[in-house]
Amino acid sequence: MKVNEESVAEFVKNLQMTQQKVETQLGKALAKSCATIQREIQESMRDTEIDISKSYYKHNKNIPHHPSMPYNPPAVDTGTLRRSITYTVDEKELVGYVGSVINDPPYGLYLEKAEYGSSRMKPRPWLKPATEKSLETIKELLKGAVKAGIK
């Protein structure tokens, strides 16, 4: 094969097109990955083990709070936290974020304490375990994206 300026230019053009295809596929896979984590978080909250012995009524209302057992995701009372779990994806930068859009005090502070615990509360992690549980699916999605992009 003879190498000349025209063949090098065509090779570079093909490489750039392949890169663009791979990045497009990765962006789609990233969105699916974030949706997978979101779904796992929401399901883990729905299925969490609760501690009936420590139930109480919140804020002088007739809404019972049944706390989750330590080292389990937060329990669902009203569904506000579970509904607030969302994700955003920047397909151009290939970055995704998954988490709660609630950051109003005191709820935002509680979410951090729930994940890591505090001096008065054992951890009730929900972000990290859901992400770890989703890792194999995410790896497969990303692998598939790269393969689809280079076809």
Which functions belong to the PLM regions below?
Residues M1-K151:
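Short, Lys/Arg-rich flexible segments
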